Amino acid sequence: MFVKDGCSECSTRVKALQAQKQPFDVYMVGSQNDDERIRNWAITSGIDPANVRTRQITLNHDGGRWLGLSLGGDLPAVVREVNGQWLRQ
C-alpha cells in the first residue's frame, strides 16, 4: 500500500486493511528517508505496533517505487502483483 503524510483517506484505508488481519507493506511516498516521520504517521493512523514487530505490517520508505510503477492516480493506493504485473486494487 502506498500512502503519504497528511492523507486522512490513507489512514482510513490502513485501518480497514489492518482489520482484515492480512499482512501488508506500507510505502510512504515523500518520506525523505525519515524513519521518525513514518513512525509518527503509523501511530496517528492507528497501526498496532505489535503488527509491525511481528512484520505482519512493514513500514517502508517509497524510494521512488510509486513513480516506477507508473500506475498514476491519487493515494492511497493498494497494489498487488498479478502474473508479474502490478495492478491497483
Locate the predicted segments by residue:
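Solvent-exposed coil/turn segments that connect beta secondary-structure elements
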Residues: K4-G6, S31-Q32, N83
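Extracytoplasmic/secreted cell-surface and envelope-processing proteins
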Residues: C10, E36-R37, Q89
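Short, surface-exposed basic-aromatic patches at helix termini and helix-loop junctions that form
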Residues: A16-Q22, A42-I47
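Thiol-based oxidoreductase modules, predominantly thioredoxin-like and allied folds used
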Residues: F24-R39, N51-D62
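Short, internal strand/loop/helix patches
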Residues: S45-D74
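A short, hydrophobic beta-strand/beta-hairpin element that forms part of a small beta-sheet core
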Residues: G73-R88
